Amino acid sequence: MEPSSDAPPFELDRFELVLLKRPTERSRISEEESDRLQALHLAHLHALTRSGAIRAAGPFDEQSDQSLRGMAIYQTGSIERTRELACSDPAVVAGRLEVDVMYFYCPKGNL
């Protein structure tokens, strides 16, 4: 079946995808410090979501690569700005998480 010539054009929106990963080497910290950093991490993500920089974020479960902890879809317009925001996360600053930033495309209007 051939595509219809009156089909709407397929357009993509561009976002920045941040993968949050557990570093291969990280020091042990107390449960209290871990809880404190987690609260600061969540507050950071919440503030970026409220500001509109993050469109969606959340943790992974049952992933094959246990170093992958979660992801966030940003819309800042640049990898550099997204990396700056992601690297200011208190859990990243403390060395508990690392970030991998890349562009992510999805059909226009899906997010």
PLM regions: where:
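Conserved, structured core segments of small domains
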Residues: 1-111
